[in-house]
């Protein structure tokens, strides 16, 4: 009789990868990274274990938005006070904090649970081409 095997968190070995976001489309890159952060690319994927990889994204300010999304895509924030709604376009978000576009897209694709919080901590986004994680010897990963 065969039994389904489940991976325990002690058995998980996380790898480090670096992705260059220059001239990559925002949604496609975010979906790819979210899948990698969850570990869904492994054949032994277990949904209740943090088995995803650690992902470093560089050149986040050079990400592409298709069509007219630079002016038409809106991001909403509310302070919690009456009249505290702030609406920004993607262009304004990119000017103020370039990594926020990418982080927000990826975070929206990861479950909003305690496990999702752990998986989100495995993402490191930098606006330039330099990052401080050279000691981990990250492998270069190409987005399909």
From Swiss-Prot:
Pfam families xref list: Ribosomal_L13
GO terms of molecular function: mRNA binding; structural constituent of ribosome
Gene Ontology cellular-component terms listed: cytosolic large ribosomal subunit
GO biological process, one term: translation
The keyword Ribonucleoprotein is assigned to this record: yes
Entry keyword Ribosomal protein: yes
Keyword list, A-Z: Ribonucleoprotein, Ribosomal protein
UniProt record similarity statement: Belongs to the universal ribosomal protein uL13 family.
Quaternary structure annotation from Swiss-Prot or TrEMBL: Part of the 50S ribosomal subunit.
Role summary: This protein is one of the early assembly proteins of the 50S ribosomal subunit, although it is not seen to bind rRNA by itself. It is important during the early stages of 50S assembly.
Name of the protein described by the UniProt record: Large ribosomal subunit protein uL13
UniProt source species: Mesomycoplasma hyopneumoniae (strain 7448)
